[in-house]
Structures are given as structure tokens and as C-alpha cells.
Curated annotation (Swiss-Prot):
The gene is nadE. Keywords: ATP-binding, Ligase, Magnesium, Metal-binding, NAD, Nucleotide-binding. This is NH(3)-dependent NAD(+) synthetase. It catalyses: deamido-NAD(+) + NH4(+) + ATP = AMP + diphosphate + NAD(+) + H(+). One of its GO terms (molecular function) is NAD+ synthase activity. Transmembrane segments: none annotated. Gene3D superfamilies: HUPs. It is an enzyme of class 6 (ligase).
Length: 275
């Protein structure tokens, strides 16, 4: 294992192997402890896309909330459907919601807000690319979730896991923004393992992962966009040797996207760019 891989593995907290029961209990306890330590929290809010990560996070959140209720805490889990117009895989969102069984579900169509934002920028002389418009979608979705959390005295859950975090494969202040990230410390295959144990429909965790943000490239697979497979990313995070080209790609993503893992830099931040 290279020196950088050792640093990354320690930072990303991925275990070589997990016990499903222990891991689920640990994540539920983390969520419950956070809620208990913040008396204002009445809701946990999460956007549900129909993909592996939001399905797992949502299920664990609802299980934690169920236990909190049994312990006398008044709180609920809010799932949010956030389509941009008509969502191509809307049936998978419904399947995920049926599996999660959330206390409350809202639907907010982000298309009018995103299109208006793009138009306003265009009128100001700023023409967004399709990729940049995709980031607008991600940020609008997170804006909506924070609005709901604010309105219901809640917090927003993130779906960021370590295979996503290492590559920076998320929109800064979009899906990368949240109050807590319960499934950080898992890689992609471990997330699948937990969903299988929890009895999720197979197609929700065996589907090809996609951010599906670009109009010109609908359902673009994550692995195609990243240029590396989740199998290699997962192996890397578990401290295993992987092909050199895959290692170089992962480490390039890690270094280039370091800014996404940090809060805003100040003049006291390291490295000191003002020198």
C-alpha cells in the first residue's frame, strides 16, 4: 500500500469487512445520539432518488426514528421526492419508498426553479453548460431539503459514503451538503451488503449507479463519468492492491477534489495559499 493510499484509507474509515448487524446498529446509534444531543430536532429530512445510497440512508433513518419514538422522543422521518419534471426511473423511487416506509413524504418538482435560474443567468449573459445545469439541479434539491428541515425543525441527512467521498463525486453545496452523513465509512459494496441484509428489493442496489443530472447524457453511469470502477475504488478503500491506472485515477480524483471535503478556506487554513 502506497503512502497516499494509507492516508486515504485512514481518512475514509472503511473497514476491510463488516458485520451487517453490527454496522446497522452502529449507524442507527449514531443517528439517535445526534438527535438526542440536539433538543430542537423534530424531523430528519432526506431526498429519495431510487438509488442505493438514498435507499439505505432512508431505511436506516426510519429505523432509528422508530426506536426514538419507542423511547419517547417525538420525531419523524421525512422523505422527499425531487423530480426534474418527469423522472425516468420514478418507479424505482416508489419502490424505495415502499421499502423505507417513511413517516411523511413530500414531492417537490424542481424543474420550474432550475429552469428559471438558468434563464435568469442567461439573461444576465451567463450561459450555463449542460453539466453546470446539472449542478443547479443538485443544489436546488438540497435547497428544498433544507427549506423543509427549517420549516419542520429538522436536519438534512446526506448520502455521502466513502467511495463517493474519495472521488469527490458529488456537487459542492449540492448533494454534498448535509447536517450529518450516516453512511460515511462504508464503500459501495458494503452499502449493497446492508441493503441485502435489510431485505431491500434487489433492483435498487443492483442497478447501475448514476447521478442522472445531465440532460444531454441521461442515466450516465457513475463509473463511466469517473473513469474507474466501484470494484477498484472499494478495493482501494479496503487497503488492497489495484491496477496502477485505476490507482492513479482514484488518487487524482482525491487530490483534485480536496476542496469539496473542506469548509471554506480562510487565511488560517492549510496549505497557506497566501504565501
Amino acid at each position: 500500500m502506497s503512502r497516499l493510499q494509507d492516508v486515504v484509507v485512514n481518512e475514509m474509515k472503511v473497514k476491510k469487512q463488516i458485520d451487517s448487524v453490527e454496522e446497522i446498529q452502529e449507524i442507527k446509534q449514531f443517528i439517535k445520539a445526534y438527535v438526542k444531543s440536539h433538543s430542537f430536532i423534530q424531523t430528519l429530512v432526506l431526498g429519495i432518488s431510487g438509488g442505493q445510497d438514498s435507499t439505505l440512508t432512508g431505511k436506516l433513518a426510519q429505523l432509528a426514528v422508530n426506536e426514538l419514538k419507542e423511547e419517547g422522543r417525538n420525531c419523524k422521518f421525512i422523505a422527499v421526492k425531487l423530480p426534474y419534471g418527469v423522472q425516468q426511473d420514478a418507479h424505482e423511487v416508489e419502490d424505495a419508498l415502499e421499502f423505507i416506509n417513511p413517516d411523511t413524504t413530500y414531492t417537490v418538482n424542481i424543474k420550474p426553479a432550475v429552469d428559471q435560474s438558468v434563464q435568469s443567468l442567461s439573461e444576465a449573459g451567463i450561459k450555463l453548460t449542460d453539466f453546470q445545469k446539472g449542478n443547479e439541479k443538485a443544489r436546488e434539491r438540497m435547497k428544498v431539503q433544507f427549506s423543509i428541515a427549517s420549516n419542520t425543525q429538522g436536519i438534512v441527512l446526506g448520502t455521502d459514503h466513502s467511495a463517493e467521498n474519495i472521488t469527490g463525486f458529488y456537487t459542492k453545496y449540492g448533494d454534498g451538503a448535509a447536517d450529518i452523513a450516516p453512511i460515511f465509512g462504508l464503500n459501495k459494496r458494503q452499502g449493497k451488503q446492508l441493503l441485502a441484509y435489510l431485505g431491500a428489493p434487489k433492483h435498487l442496489y443492483e442497478k447501475v449507479p448514476t447521478a442522472d443530472l445531465e440532460d444531454d447524457k441521461p442515466q450516465l453511469p457513475d463509473e463511466e463519468a469517473l473513469g474507474v470502477s466501484y470494484h477498484d475504488i472499494d478495493d482501494y478503500l479496503e487497503g488492497k492492491e489495484i491496477p496502477g491506472t485505476a490507482r492513479e485515477t482514484i488518487e487524482k480524483h482525491y487530490v483534485r477534489n480536496a476542496h469539496k471535503r473542506e469548509l471554506a478556506y480562510t487565511r488560517y487554513s492549510w496549505p497557506k495559499y497566501n504565501k
